[in-house]
Structure formats: C-alpha cells, structure tokens
Amino acid sequence: MVRYDLQSGADKRKLAEAVVWGGAVGDALGAGYEHRVHRGDLIDLSHMVGMEIHVEPDRPMELPAGLWTDDTSMTIALIDSLSAGHGSVDVADEAARWTAWLERGEYSSLDGMAVGTGGTTRKALLEYGHGVDSIDANGNGSLMRTSPLALTGATDAGVMLSSAVTHAHKVAKIACVAWCWFLRRLASGAAPRTAWEEALGSVGDPVLEIVSTRLHEIWRLPESEINSTGYVVDTLEACAWLVTNEERFDCYQAVVEGAVRLAGDTDTIAKIAGEAAAVAYGPESIPSTWRSETAKPELLDKVVDQLSTLIPDRL
C-alpha cells in the first residue's frame, strides 16, 4: 500500500491525483455500461465506450467515449468551492456551483451540457432550494462527490453539511463520513481491510450499522450478495467490498473492472471505488490507456493542482 508523506508537496499532489484521476477514469469507464449490461456478461474493458442518453423518451443518443458524468462534475465543483474558501465548507457556494453545472454545463466533460443528473440532486437544487431529507431520497448522489472533503481537513459535521445540500437524510450523510474516514486511513498507508474497519470505528453514529449488518468484514460476502444499485448503502457496501477484497481485486484496474462487472450503477460505483483504489495503490496504477481516453485531461490536472494546495500536513 502507498503511504503519503503529507509534509511533502509532491506527495500531496500525488494523493490529489489519486482521488481526481482515480475517480474520473472509473466514472468514464463505467459510464458506457450503466444499466446497459448484466452481471455475468462478457465485457471487453480494454477501451472505453460511449454512454447512451435519451434527449427524448424514444430518441437515444450515443455520446463519445471517455466522458465522465455528474459524479466527477460535482466533485470538481466541490473542489472549486473549497479552493475559493481556502478549504472551508461553504454550502451556499457549493449549491451555486452545482446549480451552474446543472443549468449551464459548467464543470462538465461535455461543454454546455450536464452529463447525467440524479433526481434528488435536481429537485434539491432547482425545485426545493434545500436538501431532501426523506428516507426515500437516500441515493448515492452525495457519496459520489464527497472525496475532496476527506483530504481537506473537513470535520464530520462539515462532511454532513455538504451532503445535506442535496441529500439530507442521516443515512446518506453518515455514509459520506464513513467514506471520508476510509480514504484518510488509506492515505496513511493502512491496508484496505484495516482502513475500512478503522473508518467504521471512527464514525460516531450507529445509523449505518442499523441499516446494514454487513459492513464489518464485508469482504467475506460472496459477489451474489453485493447489490450495485444507486441506494447509498448498496453503493457504500459495493465499493467497500471491491476495495477490501484484496485477493480478488489487487490493483486499481481490477477494482474498477470489478465495479463495472457488478453492473447496475456502474459509473458511480467505479468512480467511488476507483478513488479509493488509486489512493491505496497510487495514481501510477491507473492504466495509461484509460487515462489517455478520459475527457478533458487538462481540466483534471488543473483540479489536481487545486486540491493538492488544500491538503493539510496531517489528516
């Protein structure tokens, strides 16, 4: 496992690169398969394929390969907000930037168009003007973007406030807290299983263990028991299972390919698990072919630079 010396500017940039590029590549790879494949299908993942969207109910449109989706766009917008606030969480600013993405396609892999939008996120930002706290609104839309907060010294309260801009139910908020702790422990050099158990121990609220009794030692579960839906607990379990299942998924490529082969919400699960895998195995573990096929590399590198300046000397 890679251990990052946060006294070193080079290692801070390497950690930022792992999160930004590890997530974007997983997102772009998974986007072409979201709800288009079934578990057990034979898939050639050597190159990315384009995603399909519906501009009208009966009019599908194929987008170019390599585009990343709302998962990465909202992460980039969050990093931009944190950069403007010198690392502080500013929920009004976050909401404004996410709205700019939704309405004008800012922070998007496709100029002028928001690629992929979740229902809860859209309602919270464009209709309600506040986060949705219904138990039925526990999608993975805040978990998918929370990773920068793991690296910028955000408190658990700050992580939950950021989630609540769109996803305000306690389950979604605490899932974000748990994942941030997992990323921090991985960055310290802990092995994935140790990092996951320590992350669960750092969460001061029992709600996750109330809604899921499978989180501890989740790597012991067979694949048939892993659900790859957009429900935040399913996503959290799937990502933790992929990253901690070290005998089967022992590098970045294996983790992300495993995420896509689970089918279902392939882009988000590959994005979130890909961030953690790149932190654990280093950004150099991301296959160069996938990197070269990922949209807007200059923007991603700029975001890496932004995030690296926000990482404190100790997480």
Model regions and ranges:
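Structured, active/binding-site neighborhoods that engage oxygen-rich ligands
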Residues: M1-L315
